[in-house]
C-alpha cells in the first residue's frame, strides 16, 4: 500500500543524506511494515511484522546540515534489519526504554542505542512503539567533541550497541527531539538546531558508559531466521507448523522461539 507523504507547506523531497534543499519536517504514513521501512531517507532496511493486525507506521524526519533526525511510530511489533550509510553514527532513543532488543539483547532502562554506519543491525520492537533517531557524520561528531572537550572512547563507541546514560540528560535530548520533530515545527535556523542537538548528545555520550556485553549468537540467529523466512515463503500455499520448521532447520522449539 502506498505511503502518505506530507510536508508543512511544500512537497519537495530529499535528494541525498544530509543534503536537502529544505530544512522542514517531512512526515510519512504507511500501512505496510516493509513499505514503512523504505520511508527513512537513505537507510537500507527491511521490516517483518511479527504480531497480527493492521499495521500503521509514521515517520517524521528532519534533515540538518550534518545530521538526520527522526521520530518513528509503529503500531505493531516488528523485526527490523537496518543499515545506515557509511562514515556515520546512529543513536536511538526509545521513548519507553527497556522494551527494545538490539542484535538479540534487551537494551534495558536508561539506555542509548548505538551503531556505526555501514554495519547491519537488528531491532525487535513491541507494539505501540516510538523511537527517536539521530544520524550524524562521524567527522562532524568528532570535531564537535574535540571543541567541547568531551572525553569519548571512539574505539569503544564504534563497537557499541548499548550505552547506559544519565536519565536526566536522556530526557533532555528526548524532549529536544520531540520539540524539533513536532508536526507544526518549522526549522528557521538549521545550524542552531544542529548545535543544540549536538550539545545534548555530547552531554549524554560524555557521561555514559558503553555496555561491553555483545550477543555472540546474533549471527547464528540471523541465519536461522533467514532460513525460516525462506521456508515459509517457499510454502506460501500451506501453513507450516512449528514442529515442521524445527525439523527443517535442525533446531529445537525453544531455540526457534528464542530466535524470534
Residue ranges: model-predicted function:
Residues 61, 69-71, 90-91, 112-114, ...:
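Conserved hydrophobic/aromatic beta-strand scaffold that supports enzyme active sites
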Residues 256-260:
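Short hydrophobic/aromatic patch on the recognition helix
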Residues 82-85, 125-127:
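Short glycine/proline-enriched turns and hinge-like loops at secondary-structure junctions
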Residues 55-57, 86, 118, 129:
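Short beta-strand-initiation
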Residues 84-99:
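Short, conserved beta-strand element in jelly-roll/cupin
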Residues 50-84:
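Conserved short histidine dyad/triad with adjacent acidic residue
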Residues 75, 94-96, 136-137:
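Solvent-exposed residues in well-ordered beta-strands and their adjoining turns
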Residues 2-46, 99-236, 241-243, 247-253:
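Alpha-helical bundle regulatory/interaction domains
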Amino acid at each position: 500500500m502506498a505511503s502518505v507523504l506530507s510536508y508543512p507547506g511544500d512537497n519537495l523531497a530529499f535528494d541525498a543524506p544530509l543534503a536537502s534543499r529544505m530544512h522542514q519536517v517531512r512526515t510519512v504514513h504507511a500501512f505496510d511494515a516493509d513499505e514503512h521501512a523504505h520511508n527513512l531517507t537513505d537507510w537500507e532496511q527491511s521490516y517483518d511484522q511479527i504480531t497480527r493486525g493492521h499495521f500503521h507506521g509514521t515517520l517524521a524526519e528532519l534533515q540538518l546540515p550534518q545530521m538526520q533526525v527522526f521520530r518513528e511510530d509503529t503500531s505493531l511489533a516488528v523485526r527490523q534489519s537496518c543499515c545506515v550509510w557509511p562514515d556515520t553514527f546512529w543513536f536511538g532513543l526509545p521513548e519507553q526504554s527497556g522494551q527494545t532488543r538490539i542484535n538479540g539483547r534487551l537494551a534495558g532502562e536508561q539506555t542509548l542505542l548505538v551503531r556505526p554506519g555501514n554495519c547491519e543491525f537488528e531491532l525487535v520492537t513491541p507494539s505501540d512503539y516510538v523511537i527517536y533517531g539521530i544520524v550524524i557524520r562521524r567527522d562532524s561528531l568528532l570535531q564537535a567533541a574535540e571543541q567541547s572537550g568531551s572525553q569519548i572512547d571512539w574505539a569503544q563507541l564504534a563497537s557499541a550497541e548499548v550505552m547506559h546514560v544519565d536519565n536526566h540528560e536522556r530526557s533532555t535530548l528526548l524532549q529536544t527531539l520531540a520539540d524539533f520533530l513536532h508536526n507544526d515545527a518549522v526549522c528557521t535556523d538549521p545550524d542552531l538546531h544542529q548545535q543544540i542537538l549536538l550539545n545534548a548528545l555530547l552531554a549524554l555520550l560524555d557521561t555514559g558508559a558503553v555496555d561491553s556485553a555483545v550477543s555472540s549468537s546474533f549471527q547464528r540467529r540471523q541465519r536461522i531466521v533467514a532460513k525460516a523466512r525462506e521456508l515459509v515463503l517457499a510454502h506460501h500455499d500451506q501453513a507450516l507448523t512449528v514442529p515442521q520448521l524445527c525439523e527443517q532447520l535442525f533446531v529445537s522449539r525453544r531455540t526457534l522461539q528464542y530466535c524470534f
